[in-house]
Every structure is written in structure tokens, then in C-alpha cells.
Amino acid sequence: MDTTLSHTPGSRLSQYLALTKPRVTQLAVFCAVIGMFLATPGMVPWKVLLGGTIGIGLLAGSAFAINCLVEQKIDAMMRRTAWRPSARGEITTLQILAFSTVLGGLGAWTLYTFTNPLTIWLTIATFVGYAVIYTLLLKPMTPQNIVIGGASGAMPPALGWAAVTGAVPGDAWILVLIIFVWTPPHFWVLALYRRKDYENAGLPMLPVTHGEQFTRLHILLYTVILFAVTMMPFISGMSGAVYLTSAVLLGALFLAYAWKIYRDYSDALARRAFRYSIVYLSLLFAALLVDHYARPVIGM
């Protein structure tokens, strides 16, 4: 008698939810919401906030489901991803396609109903950039997959900004640039301590193709560039002292991790740096939000 939970409604729901990579989706949606609030000096209209958040989240989940479908054989060979229901064969190809289509359709309809055409097209372009260009073309072909493909993953703040204003001005692109430059060191520290996984799966990640030392150097270089780029919101006048102080402190710790990885690497250190990189981006964007509403009050 089969006593597993794989056929219960709750476990089936959790399997489908896992396809959307909830933690990654949450971070993407969080950055999009910050983009919405930074786009206006007041409050975001609740219909735009709700519709934009749900629509962007659904389309992001749809793209991640396609990623799981395309990479199910690769995921099955990697310890980090072998647990995914797609890799374990617990959900069929047709079911994943149907699930992704429903999510994508609902997301596009929600954005059409509550936002504007620019937001829809930008979000769909982001979907194609991640699910097709990155997943199918870049990731299995070049060690620069993260650098080039990071453009689609960096778009959420621009999507949020467009949802509110119907435009994507320079300040929104600064936010995109921050995530774009953050992406390589974030993923490369993961690739360092998961190098064997990527090697076994045949993926040309930087540590596999160019070695550990080369990757460690580039993590440091990109983290230095990231520190400089995070000064741009203050330099452009978009943010004030609250953000600047936060960016300097958060960036200094990220630089310390990158320097330590370069000089005295260990897998345990890389794991801590990877976890911190997620906290770093979340707190950096939270600081942008706090500064946005605190600045008129404190005058800094």
C-alpha cells in the first residue's frame, strides 16, 4: 500500500508551488513593489499595487515553471535541485506546461486589467528573456550566462515603476543596473561551492570552465563595481542620507565577504556569502523605500 503523501491535495499543491521557485519569486516581486513606491511621491493606488504585484508574481512563477520543465533532467543530476517535483518525475511535462500557461495567462490578464500596456509588454519580454533566452540558450552554452541573462532577472523594479507611471525613466534603470551587477557575484559564490553539481550536469558555469581562482577574482571585481553602482541613487538625487548610509554599510560587508573569498576561500564561507547576498539586496531595496518616505520628513 502506498503511504506517501504525493497524491494528497496538500502535497500536490506544494509540488506545483515548488515549480514557481517561491523564494526567488518573492524577491523579484519585492523589488517590483519597491519600484512602484519609488515611482510616486505619494502612495501607490491600491488597484495598481495589488494588480501589479499579483500580475508580475504570476508571470514570474510561470517563467520559473518553464525553467523547471526545461531543466528537469539537469536538476535530477544536481543535489541542490534533485528534490524538485519536476526532477523527480512527480509532475508530467503536460501538467507543467498547463500550469505555466494558466499562470502566465492570469498574470497577463491581471496586468492588462489593472496596469498599462507598457507593463504587460515589459513583463512578457522579461518572461521570454528568462524562460527562453537564458534557460534554453545562454545557460547551457556560455559561462557568461549569468552576466548576459541577468538582464531579465534585473527587470522587476522597472516593471513596478512602469505599472505606476506608464514609463521607465532613468531612476528606474539605475535600480535595474543594481540588480544586474549584483547577479553575477550572487550566483558565482553559489557555483563555487556547488561546482561539482554543475560539472556533473554539464553546465558551463564560470568555476567549471575557468577555475576557482578566476571565479573568486571576478566575484571580487563585480562586488567592487556593485558598491560603486549602489552610490548612483544618491548621486542622481533619487535617494538621500538614509539610503547612502545603508548602502555603504551593506556594501562594505559584501566587499568583506568577497575579499575573504578571494584570499581565503572555503565552501562554508561561500555559503554564508550566498545567503548574505540575498539579505543584502532585500535590505538595500528596503533602505530605498524607507529613504523615499523619510527624506521629506528629515530633510536629508
Curated annotation (Swiss-Prot):
Remaining remarks: Carbon 2 of the heme B porphyrin ring is defined according to the Fischer nomenclature.
Record-level Gene Ontology MF annotations: protoheme IX farnesyltransferase activity
Keyword list, A-Z: Cell inner membrane, Cell membrane, Heme biosynthesis, Membrane, Transferase, Transmembrane, Transmembrane helix
GO BP annotations listed: heme O biosynthetic process
Role summary: Converts heme B (protoheme IX) to heme O by substitution of the vinyl group on carbon 2 of heme B porphyrin ring with a hydroxyethyl farnesyl side group.
Lineage, broadest ranks: Bacteria, Pseudomonadati, Pseudomonadota, Betaproteobacteria, Burkholderiales
Protein name from the UniProt record: Protoheme IX farnesyltransferase
Keyword Phosphoprotein carried by entry: no
Membrane topology (UniProt): Multi-pass membrane protein
PROSITE patterns: UBIA
Reaction(s) this enzyme catalyzes, per UniProt: heme b + (2E,6E)-farnesyl diphosphate + H2O = Fe(II)-heme o + diphosphate
EC id: 2.5.1.141
Pathway terms, separated by semicolons: Porphyrin-containing compound metabolism; heme O biosynthesis; heme O from protoheme: step 1/1
Record's subcellular location: Cell inner membrane
NCBIfam families given in the database record: cyoE_ctaB, PRK04375.1-2
Sequence intervals crossing the membrane: 24-44, 48-68, 94-114, 118-138, 146-166, 172-192, 217-237, 239-259, 278-298
Gene Ontology CC annotation, any one: plasma membrane
Family: Belongs to the UbiA prenyltransferase family. Protoheme IX farnesyltransferase subfamily.
Source taxon at top rank: Bacteria
